[in-house]
């Protein structure tokens, strides 16, 4: 739709009314990354282009929606037009690269991915990978019991095969960090940076994949295409049961949903923000109906995202069979609805939600079509807007089940100021209530006056700990031994003469290069018998 004009098209076709023709580019043969399924995205080869109606064709996708369509193109040499972009001609085994301005590629350390996995294990139990840095590859375990990955760092681990001109990949053949049919496994104290694909996947049903743990790890810049991934297409995926995801940090992600880790998940003490940038719909902590029983979601900081914070999902109305999730002591701010509670028999207590709400209620305890949450418990929460509707007021949509107005702070009915105004210093992560505030007096929210729990990793991720980019010239004074590729930052010692008595003394020199030149001393009187015509300094020796 463009103004008053509508341009209809169906699955397998896309109309770009202005962009393609203005570019003068024929996309036939390129790969389109197509977000045409709301929270699902696919890659497809473009099979034809009609410049008359600005449309291109591709093989149909499995779950096409009628709105919110976005795409970008890859896979043709003509698309390279910005420094840093590259294209691999798979047929001719040739790599094309446009370097940054002023950079000579022959003088740089340019590396390319040559293998998918740096480590693979099948039927190996109690294996430990420790203190290993993975660059442009990752690890994979299959049929493993009690395997551990710890204190390891992965740069460019998961990736796609689009650079090989392969579109629409089989989700089971993606080159991603994964565990298949493995239980009791642990990933801890590690970092995952820059992926084109999920950060990590655990495959297998409840009896094949259970009691797996991801803890105290850092995830950044995860999935810049969000395409061709399994299931709901999420950032962290587990298909099994009893997974634990705790004390982690995640930020800057593409997929609409972030953490979806199977039946009866435990998600605690995580800090997550800036998520779901490439797809519609979604939630940070996502639970479908069967996954909600015995789910335990607590002590998390979730903020600054246009997605739902924590969602017990499922269809609307009486068909929703999600039951028995416990969600407590979470702080959520600047999110598009902090809590979405669908189903029944849930326990939602001691949560704090405030800030930008993107026109949704902060805590939604959904009652729809005469069904929902009649037996749920909602107490000791603090939020500006709590109701049984996505946007409607508490007066029009009162919360069902066990809900007592005096045991919650709800800005719809309480007029003691916003939740944020009643917190000590939320900008600096002090979410305790101010003494004498309504939240303080009612003992509601995620923090009491003496609480000091903190979400996220117990270690601080710093670039200096993992200087993957840096100066790689051993002669430079800022040479970084751990750098994997050059960032053009090399600084060199100033060489020169460092003797103040020399005539070419350099006061800025840091390294003496042996170049000192000295004044010739001697008799400079031409009438003297020992006159030295080359003398530059008279030494008083004239006779």
Name what the model sees in each region.
Residues 246, 252, 259-261, 268, ...:
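Core solenoid repeat modules with strong leucine/isoleucine-rich periodicity
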Residues 113-118, 135-136, 164-179, 194-206, ...:
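Extracellular beta-strand/beta-solenoid scaffold signature
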Residues 120-128, 145-148, 173-188, 202-215, ...:
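Surface-exposed loop/turn motifs in large extracellular/passenger domains
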Residues 1-174, 178-180, 428-435, 440-465:
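Extracellular polysaccharide-degrading/modifying enzymes targeting complex plant/algal/animal polysaccharides
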Residues 99, 123, 131, 136, ...:
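Residues on the solvent-exposed faces and adjacent turns
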Residues 465-543:
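Primarily marks secretory-pathway-exposed extracellular/lumenal segments that are disulfide-
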Residues 302, 318-430:
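Predominantly extracellular beta-rich ligand-binding scaffolds that present long acidic/polar faces
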